[in-house]
Amino acid sequence: MKLIISEKEIAAKRIAGILSGDGQKEEKVYGVPVYYIKHGSDECAVIGLKGHILKVDFPKEYSNWFKVDPVDLIDAEIEKTPIHKNIVQALKKVAGNASEVIIATDFDREGELIGYDAWQVAIEKNSLLNAKRAKFSALTNSDIDSAFAKLEKLDLNLAFAGRARQDIDLIWGAVLTRFISLASYQVKENFLSVGRVQSPTLTLIVDREIEIGEFVAIPYWVVNIKLKTDRGEEFEATHKKKRFLKKEEASKAFSKISGEGEVLDVNETIRSMAPPTPFNTTSLIVSANSIGFTAAKTINIAENLYMNGYISYPRTDNTVYPASIDLKEIVKMLKVSDSFADACSDVLKQSKITPSRGKKRTTDHPPIYPTFSVSRQRLGSDEWKLYELIVRRFLCTLLPPGQIKSIAANINVGGEVFVANGSNIIKENWIKHYHYYKHEDVYIPNLVPGQKLKIIDREMLDKETKPPARYTQGKLVEKMEELGLGTKATRHTIIQTLISRGYITGNPLVPSEKAIAVVKILKKHAEKISSPDMTSELEMDMDGIARGDETREEVVEKSREMLKDVMVNLKNVKADISQEIKKAVKEDFIIGKCRQKDCDGNLIVRVSKKSRKRFIGCNAYPKCTSTFSLPQLGMILTTKDKCKHCDYPVIRIITKGRKPWDLCINGDCPGKDEKYKNYKSKKPGQESSD
C-alpha cells in the first residue's frame, strides 16, 4: 500500500477522488479521515494534515521566563514536538502497512518541510519507507494525474531551508521578545513581541508615521479659469505653472484674467494602456486590498478556492504564463459563465492570443489563474468577489492594450498661458472588462489655434502639500517584497501578528505608542533588528540552502552569531529600555482627556477591585469619578479619533476571530441605537473604581 500525504484534509479528499474516479472509501483513524483508494494497480491511503504537524521549541527547562537568561536561548538545543497529536498517531498507524510514501503537499519551502516532517514521523513506525514527490500547481484532474504519473524525489534542500527558517525565527523571536518584555516588565498577556521579520516590517510603518508627524506643509496657489466656446461648450483650464509658491505671483496672474482667451495650439497624443500582468501573490494582495480585503483575508479565501480546485496555487512569485498552460482552453471553459461570456468572446475572436508578461519568472508555480468555471451561487459573497477578480485579471491579460487619446490646448489669457487637458478612451479592449481600473474621461471641445473663447469664471485656490500616505496592507506587502522581508507565504501573517499584538490598527495602518517606542529603542540600540538588511541577508542564505550552496547548520549558526552581537548592545542599555517602553505603554492606555468640567485628568483603562471588570475612568480619581463601561472581551486600542456624533473618544476593539470594530465610549451617544444604550453601555459614574 502507498501512503499519500497532503497538506490539508480537503486536499486529501479531492486528490483521492481524482485518483480513484470518486471511488474512495473513508475511514477515521484517531478521528482523522483517511481515504482508501485504488489507483491503477496500487492500493493507496490518502491522509490530510493541518499544515505543520510538528513545531520547533526549546526543551522544558528553558520555559520559565524569569529563571532563564534570554541570551542562554541562543545556543540552546532545539526540539521538534507534535502540534496535532491525533494526526501524528494516525500517520504512524497507517504508515505501518505502507510500502512507500508520496508527498503531495504544496510545492514550496513550507510545503516541502511539512511533507518531510510527515515522512520522518512515518519512518518512526516503518523505517523502510522511501519518499517520492508529487508536484502540482492546481487541484484539477489533469494536474493531479500528471503529477502522479511522473513522481519525483523529495527536495531535501528545500525542506532544510524551511527548517532553517523555523530555527532562526524561534531563536530570534524568543530571545528578543523575552529580553524586551522582561526589561519593560511587560510579561504574560502583555508581552512585547519582537522578531526577525516583524520588527523591520513594523519599522516601515513607524518610520512612515514619524515622517507624517514631522511633515511641514508648504502652501501653494492654483489659478483656474472656466471658458465657453461660441457654440456654448464649457470647459476648464489651469495656469501652465500649475503651482505658484508665492501668493503675489498667483495674484498677479489672477488679476490678468478678463475678457476672452485665444487658443495658441492644440496637441493630441494617443497612448497605449498595456493590459495588467498575470497575478502573483503580491499583486493579488494589492489588488484585493482595493476591494476591501486584508492581506490575511485574501490569502485565506484564495487558499480555499485553490483547495476546491477553482484556481491555481495562490503562493507564487511568477508573472509569466508557462507554455504548458492551454490558455485558450481555459477561456473556452470560462465562457459558459454568463458573468464572463462577453470577455471570453473578445479573447477568443482574436486571431492570436498574446498574454501580457510581468518581470518575474519562476519555474515552481505559474501565475494565479482560474482552473474551473464556478457559478456565483456556489460561492460565498467574498469568495465570489475574489474569484471574479482572478478571472477578470486572467482574461484581461489575454486582451490587447487599450488606447487613450489625450488633448492639451494652450490658451492665452491676458498674456498668461493656461492649459486645458482632456482625455478619453478610444479603444477599450481589456479596460472594458476590468472594472477595477477606473478612468474618468475629461471633456474639452474641439479647439483650433486662433479660436476665441469667452471667460465665464475664475478662481485662485489656497492649497498646501500633503504628507506621504500611510501604508495600506497591500502597499506594505509590496514594500516587504521589494526589501526582501518575509516570503510570499509569510508576509500576510506578519501583518496579522503585528495587529494581534496591538502594534498596529486600521487600514491604512497606524502604529500604537508602544510600537513607536519599541522601534525607536531598536533603532537606537540594535539597528540590525529594525533594518531590513539583516533579514534580507538571512532570506538569501535560506535560498542558498534550497539551491544546495549552503547548509542549514551554517546559516543557523551565522544567525546565532548575529544575535549575540545584538544582545551585547541591548544588555548594556536595559535600564533605558525599561523606562522608554513603560512610558509608551502608559501613553497607550490614555483614551483621551476627561470630559468633566474643571477636570484636567486623562481617561484611562482601569480594572475594578471588586468585580475585576475593566472600565474607563479618570486618572484624577477620587477627585473625579467619571467612568465609562467597556466590553469585557478583546484588546482595547486608542485611536485618537473623536466620535462624529458627540465628540467623545473612539476606541478600537480587537477580538480573536472577529473583525476589529470601533466604539464611542459615550453610552448616550446619539449615534448608538436604543438597544445598545439600554443594555450595553452605562452612563458616566455607574462603574465603581474601588
Regions found by a protein language model. Give the residues of each.
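Intrinsically disordered, low-complexity regulatory segments
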Residues: 1-166, 170-174
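Basic, low-complexity terminal or inter-domain segments flanking catalytic cores
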Residues: 2-3, 35, 121, 177, ...
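Structured, non-catalytic alpha/beta "coupling" segments that mediate domain-domain communication
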Residues: 29-59, 199-245, 396-443, 617
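Phosphate-interacting basic helix/loop segments used at nucleotide- and nucleic-acid interfaces
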Residues: 76-101, 204-205, 286-287, 388-395, ...
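C-terminal or mid-to-C-terminal helical accessory/interaction module adjacent to the motor/catalytic core
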Residues: 83, 96-97, 139-224, 268-272
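Metal- or metallocofactor-binding catalytic centers and their adjacent structured scaffolds
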Residues: 244-277, 285, 451
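N-terminal cationic and glycine-rich segments that engage phosphates or anionic surfaces
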Residues: 280
